[in-house]
């Protein structure tokens, strides 16, 4: 009564195949399989101990003096333009 019979599911499957086509469904299936495989590989790689990994060396840090010097070079003096 409240559940779906096998005939209901077969009709739904037939409609889905007619709407999307077999090629589109095959592509979606392979994409989904690749995503699941990538997820499993990521979970497997994430479980490695930190001792096995190489330490991350931070990129060169910009000091406040370097940032101020760069900002000063990029600043345009509006009053100097008006005086000329």
Swiss-Prot record:
Cellular compartments per GO CC: TAT protein transport complex
Pfam families, per the entry: TatA_B_E (PF02416)
InterPro entries per record: TatA/B/E, TatA/E
Domain of life: Bacteria
Region (Disordered): 40-84
Transmembrane intervals: 1-21
Localisation: Cell inner membrane
Comp. bias regions, Basic and acidic residues: 69-84
Keyword Cytoplasm in annotation: no
GO biological process entries: protein transport by the Tat complex
Gene Ontology molecular function terms on file: protein transmembrane transporter activity
Keywords: Cell inner membrane, Cell membrane, Membrane, Protein transport, Translocation, Transmembrane, Transmembrane helix, Transport
Gene3D superfamilies listed in its UniProt record: 1.20.5.3310
Bilayer topology term: Single-pass membrane protein
Function: Part of the twin-arginine translocation (Tat) system that transports large folded proteins containing a characteristic twin-arginine motif in their signal peptide across membranes. TatA could form the protein-conducting channel of the Tat system.
Similarity section: Belongs to the TatA/E family.
Annotated NCBIfam families: PRK02958.1, tatAE
PANTHER family recorded: SEC-INDEPENDENT PROTEIN TRANSLOCASE PROTEIN TATA
Oligomer and partners: The Tat system comprises two distinct complexes: a TatABC complex, containing multiple copies of TatA, TatB and TatC subunits, and a separate TatA complex, containing only TatA subunits. Substrates initially bind to the TatABC complex, which probably triggers association of the separate TatA complex to form the active translocon.
Protein name as it appears in the record: Sec-independent protein translocase protein TatA
